[in-house]
């Protein structure tokens, strides 16, 4: 299977997000890379599902809380930028303060 660098990045994000999802389901607090992957994958899927940019941006602030992540992680993530594929093309989505 031949994948472009972008496709490889998406696959890596998905794999890390799946691991984060499983750890969260077991009651573990997510670390920085897990939180980033979890939110990023969810944003990419929401865009793929046909949500608008505004809906995806809002959705990004509802995925994790401070109780879901290790201490200090929310302060390490002031914003997340994701290049997501929407039905009308690829757009850059920025979520400010994704972990309120």
Swiss-Prot record:
It comes from the Bacteria. It catalyses: urea + 2 H2O + H(+) = hydrogencarbonate + 2 NH4(+). It is found in: Cytoplasm. Pathway: Nitrogen metabolism; urea degradation; CO(2) and NH(3) from urea (urease route): step 1/1. It is an enzyme of class 3 (hydrolase). Pfam families: Urease_gamma. PANTHER family: UREASE. Heterotrimer of UreA (gamma), UreB (beta) and UreC (alpha) subunits. Three heterotrimers associate to form the active enzyme. Belongs to the urease gamma subunit family. HAMAP family: Urease_gamma. This is Urease subunit gamma. It comes from Paraburkholderia xenovorans (strain LB400). The lineage of its organism: Bacteria, Pseudomonadati, Pseudomonadota, Betaproteobacteria, Burkholderiales.
């Amino acid at each position: 299977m031949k994948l472009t660098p972008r496709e490889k990045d998406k696959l890596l994000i998905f794999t890390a997000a799946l691991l984060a999802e499983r750890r969260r389901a077991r009651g573990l607090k997510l670390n920085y890379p897990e939180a980033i992957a979890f939110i990023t994958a969810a944003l990419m899927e929401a865009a793929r599902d046909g949500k608008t940019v505004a809906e995806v941006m809002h959705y990004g602030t509802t995925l994790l809380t401070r109780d879901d992540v290790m201490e200090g992680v929310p302060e390490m993530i002031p914003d997340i930028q994701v290049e997501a594929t929407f039905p009308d093309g690829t757009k850059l989505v920025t979520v400010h303060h994704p972990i309120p």
